[in-house]
UniProtKB/Swiss-Prot annotation:
Catalyzes the oxidation of 5,10-methylenetetrahydrofolate to 5,10-methenyltetrahydrofolate and then the hydrolysis of 5,10-methenyltetrahydrofolate to 10-formyltetrahydrofolate. It comes from Buchnera aphidicola subsp. Cinara cedri (strain Cc). This is Bifunctional protein FolD. Belongs to the tetrahydrofolate dehydrogenase/cyclohydrolase family. GO terms for cellular component: cytosol. NADP(+) binds at G166, S167, S168, I232. It catalyses: (6R)-5,10-methylene-5,6,7,8-tetrahydrofolate + NADP(+) = (6R)-5,10-methenyltetrahydrofolate + NADPH; (6R)-5,10-methenyltetrahydrofolate + H2O = (6R)-10-formyltetrahydrofolate + H(+). The gene is folD.
Amino acid sequence: METKILDGLKISKKIIKKIKKKIEKRKKKRKKIPGLAMIVIGNNPASLIYVNKKREACNQAGFFSIYWHLSNQIEEIELINLIKKLNKNKCIDGILIQLPLPIKINYLKIITSIDPKKDVDGFHPYNLGSLCQNNPQFRSCTSKGVITLLKKYKINIHGLYAVIIGSSNIVGKPMYMELLLAGCTVTIVNKNTKNIKTYVKKADLVVIAIGQPNFLYGHWIKLGAIVIDIGINYLYNKNKYKIVGDVHFKSTSVKTSYITPVPGGVGPMTVVSLLENTLQACIM
């Protein structure tokens, strides 16, 4: 069957252009420009790439951004103190902590130290809890990006049976709520689930985010299913790195109605969702 590629890169560029026009209007009216603070700890190659893409997007949209690249040796209290200063800084509308964090740093302590009004990543318990009530201040960027991408391609998911592979706080759980609110019947599975394949074979919509390259093959997929690949993995081959998703694209794409590529699918939509949230924080 003919498969349509969900081109997140193309859609994100269009959204950034619209955001840029809004920023230009704000500048003409001498209104405040959105400000985003980004913090990355250590030298994880993937984290550095993600942050650079976010910085680049800020520049394209006309945002003010500031960047901290901190050592792995930083103490938890030092990071919390930096966040507290940024909470008080009126030039900063959004605070982003690039994940993952070093093992010695408590993720929940860091996230809850961010002012919920500046939690543009949508990970604060306040915002995640509000999402359950369909009234979040900020929606988590990746799951928001997925929903936006589906809407831009006019894909109606209401009434579909959706399976999410991966139950992380960052992607799986927010994605579960987004799909539930969109009218899907949702099952979430993880590494502890037995016979994952049996759930996936019944799914109209599959979302995967587990960080395992080529985990999902085409023979798992129901003919005509929609597949959203959120995984980003770096494989070293022939003296260079290749980016692949959690889905084996070649075998899966021949069975799907819609599929996201990696790279160029969900990643750019995550970045543009961050810009939308930061602009919203500025306007609030």
